[in-house]
Amino acid sequence: MPKMKTKSSAKKRFRVRPGGTVKRGQAFKRHILTKKTTKNKRHLRGIVNVHEGDMGSIAKMLPSAGL
């Protein structure tokens, strides 16, 4: 049976932390920022964890991550 391939888009977007959680960047922070408030842009900073309900699809996209 051939090797399971990792989705190239997923390996660029997600990183697995040592505890088994997956971190991701925030969306809505790339363009059209003039109409967004400063408070809204400030809350979009930083890294957040992937929601528990999405971990199944992330595990399928990253088979070698051991999730």
UniProtKB/Swiss-Prot annotation:
Alphabetically ordered keywords of this record:
Ribonucleoprotein, Ribosomal protein
Could you mention a single GO BP entry for this protein?
A: translation
Q: Which GO terms describe its cellular component?
A: cytosolic large ribosomal subunit
Entry keyword annotation includes Ribosomal protein: yes
- Which Pfam families does the record cross-reference, listed alphabetically? Ribosomal_L35p
Which molecular-function annotation in GO is an example for this chain?
structural constituent of ribosome
Does the keyword Repeat feature in the UniProt annotation?
no
Q: Which pairs are disulfide-linked?
A: none
Protein name as annotated: Large ribosomal subunit protein bL35
Which source organism? Answer: Acidovorax ebreus (strain TPSY) (Diaphorobacter sp. (strain TPSY))
**What gene is it encoded by?**
rpmI
